[in-house]
């Protein structure tokens, strides 16, 4: 008597397995945009009536908008490290803005958000201003790929010699030379 019940239960489980597997692939995309010196009220999706931000507004309307958030630091390098690690930046090795050529950098053994996402099957990418070390694209300090990014396209701090046609972008550890256009369009 128990055998037909177990057989029916196994058939039910086996037939629902493809549905469960297909839903496992329906994870949301995660896009984090970090901008230096951007305040809560600077975006029109948060109420600014002077500055228009239609592309960010569209992302906000189709995704999740956070209304209670804090920066781990008022300057760029530590705020990036705090966001990636979830820790107080000085505990991760970065306590201030990092000038080019400086020895300060995020500790290589930090457990970062990209590492966590990779462990759950996400592909990870970083594009734009890195600024988590002073010796960018040098073996003396860890680089974006060491913190869980499958692909990265970045500068250490600012585009140079200017934001138009910058020459200092690096893709996965290799210099790309001059890139035509404005850096904000190139990294997007």
Question: What is the meaning of each model-derived region?
Answer:
Residues 2, 7, 15-16, 21-188:
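Formylglycine-dependent sulfatase
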């Amino acid at each position: 008597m128990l055998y037909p019940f177990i057989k029916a239960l196994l058939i039910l489980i086996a037939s629902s397995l493809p549905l469960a597997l297909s839903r496992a692939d329906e994870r949301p995309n995660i896009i984090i945009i970090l901008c230096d010196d951007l305040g809560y009220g600077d975006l029109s999706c948060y109420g600014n009536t002077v500055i228009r931000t239609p592309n960010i507004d569209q992302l906000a309307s189709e995704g999740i908008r956070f209304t209670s958030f804090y920066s781990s630091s008022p300057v760029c390098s530590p705020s990036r490290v705090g966001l990636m690690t979830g820790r107080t930046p000085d505990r991760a090795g970065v306590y201030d803005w990092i000038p080019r050529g400086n020895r300060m950098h995020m500790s290589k053994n930090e457990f970062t958000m990209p590492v966590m996402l990779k462990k759950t099957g996400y592909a990870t990418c970083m594009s734009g201003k890195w600024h988590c070390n002073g010796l960018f694209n040098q073996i003396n300090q860890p680089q974006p790929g060491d913190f869980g990014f499958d692909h990265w396209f970045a500068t250490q701090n600012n585009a140079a010699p200017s934001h138009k046609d910058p020459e200092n972008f690096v893709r996965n550890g290799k210099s790309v030379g001059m890139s035509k256009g404005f850096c904000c369009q190139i990294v997007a």
